[in-house]
């Protein structure tokens, strides 16, 4: 079966199943190309919550499909690759988070959406990289527990006088980008702004001309007068950046910026998931209800 035939078959199955295909910005190019909606975690969470489709095919990693199930329990949520996990999400367990909460009674937990449903259920509010600063600024408490990403937490702490108790988690892919590599690239390309994701190491973030979520990168690069950019996030973002800005050049800050989990999902996987209507991700009600409370609090914060 050719790729074009496969794409046509997927489109036909999507229609037949009354399904919507959501793809994260880090997916393979060909998967993003057939998606009904591409976006970051926040954008896709919002789409999952409001879609009229009966079936959500989530091309991303496990915690994203869980979020869709939490927000739209009446929908069937398919995750084409059940083994597409997130190492950072796995760095925080419910038991360990409960221990931290017990040591810091009354301190609210802000959890990055890159976490399991069970961890979200232990949290007061969730955030994404797109709204994390706003979420923390909306809180009246003077101290917060922030999990699981220490790098995102360090970045948000710059914009508030709150005391942060940071979980020691991180994204292995973003952590691979080293400051010395960025310095060399900036020296070699002085006309190119360095745009990076807040999941990068703080020493890398310090070198950035602009720090933002993947959606923020699309907006920034589109509006900027610059013609060349150094991009500090997962390689999958380049597909849409190049498509939306054909007259601009994008330099990936490092060839190491590839997430193996995000690259697992193929067109064949999407086709099989739709054909067989599995694997299904369904969050149990005892976890879903408290997790939804944390996500709803996040979604209630006004967007720009």
Swiss-Prot record:
Q: What does this protein do?
A: Catalyzes the condensation of iminoaspartate with dihydroxyacetone phosphate to form quinolinate.
Q: Which family does it belong to?
A: Belongs to the quinolinate synthase family. Type 2 subfamily.
Q: Name one GO cellular component term.
A: cytosol
Cite the annotated pathway: Cofactor biosynthesis; NAD(+) biosynthesis; quinolinate from iminoaspartate: step 1/1
Q: Give the cofactors, semicolon-separated.
A: [4Fe-4S] cluster
Kindly give the Pfam families that the UniProt entry links to this protein.
Answer: NadA
Task: Please list the residues that bind [4Fe-4S] cluster.
Answer: 86, 171, 259
Which InterPro entries does the record match to this protein? NadA, NadA_sf, Quinolinate_synth_type2
Q: Which GO terms describe its molecular function?
A: 4 iron, 4 sulfur cluster binding; metal ion binding; quinolinate synthetase A activity
Q: Which GO terms describe its biological process?
A: 'de novo' NAD biosynthetic process from L-aspartate
* UniProt remark on cofactor binding: Binds 1 [4Fe-4S] cluster per subunit.
Q: Can you say where in the cell this protein is located?
A: Cytoplasm
| Coiled-coil residue windows | none
EC number, UniProt record: 2.5.1.72
Residues that bind iminosuccinate, according to the entry? 24, 41, 112-114, 129, 197-199, 214
| Protein's UniProt keywords contain Transport | no
Record SUPFAM superfamilies: NadA-like
Which taxonomic lineage is given here?
A: Bacteria, Pseudomonadati, Thermodesulfobacteriota, Desulfuromonadia, Geobacterales
**Which key words tag this protein in UniProt?**
4Fe-4S, Cytoplasm, Iron, Iron-sulfur, Metal-binding, Pyridine nucleotide biosynthesis, Transferase
Name of the protein: Quinolinate synthase
This enzyme catalyses: iminosuccinate + dihydroxyacetone phosphate = quinolinate + phosphate + 2 H2O + H(+)
């Amino acid at each position: 079966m050719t790729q074009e035939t496969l794409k046509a078959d997927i489109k036909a199955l999507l229609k037949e199943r009354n399904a919507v295909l959501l793809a994260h910005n880090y997916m393979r190019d060909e998967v993003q190309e057939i998606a009904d909606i591409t976006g970051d975690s926040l954008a896709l969470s919002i789409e999952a919550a409001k879609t009229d489709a009966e079936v959500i095919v989530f091309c991303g990693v496990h915690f994203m499909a869980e979020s869709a199930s939490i927000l739209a329990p009446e929908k069937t949520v398919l995750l084409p690759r059940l083994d597409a996990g997130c190492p950072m999400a796995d760095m925080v367990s419910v038991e360990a988070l409960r221990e931290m909460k017990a040591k810091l009674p009354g301190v609210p937990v802000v959890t990055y959406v890159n976490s399991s449903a069970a961890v979200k259920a232990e949290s007061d509010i969730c955030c994404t990289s797109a709204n994390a600063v706003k979420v923390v600024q909306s809180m009246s408490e003077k101290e917060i527990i922030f999990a699981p990403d220490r790098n995102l937490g360090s970045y948000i702490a710059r914009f508030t006088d709150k005391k942060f108790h940071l979980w020691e988690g991180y994204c292995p892919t973003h952590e691979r980008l080293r400051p010395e590599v960025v310095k060399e690239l900036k020296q070699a390309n002085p006309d190119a702004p360095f745009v990076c994701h807040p999941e990068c190491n703080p020493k890398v973030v310090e070198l950035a001309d602009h720090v933002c979520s993947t959606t923020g990168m699309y907006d920034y690069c589109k509006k900027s007068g610059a013609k060349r950019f150094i991009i500090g996030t997962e390689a999958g973002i380049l597909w849409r950046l190049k498509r939306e800005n054909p007259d601009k050049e994008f330099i990936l800050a490092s060839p190491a910026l590839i997430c193996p989990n995000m690259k697992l999902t193929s067109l064949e996987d999407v086709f099989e998931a739709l054909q067989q209507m599995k694997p299904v991700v369904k969050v149990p009600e005892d976890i879903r209800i408290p997790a939804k409370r944390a996500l709803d609090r996040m979604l209630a914060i006004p967007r720009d």
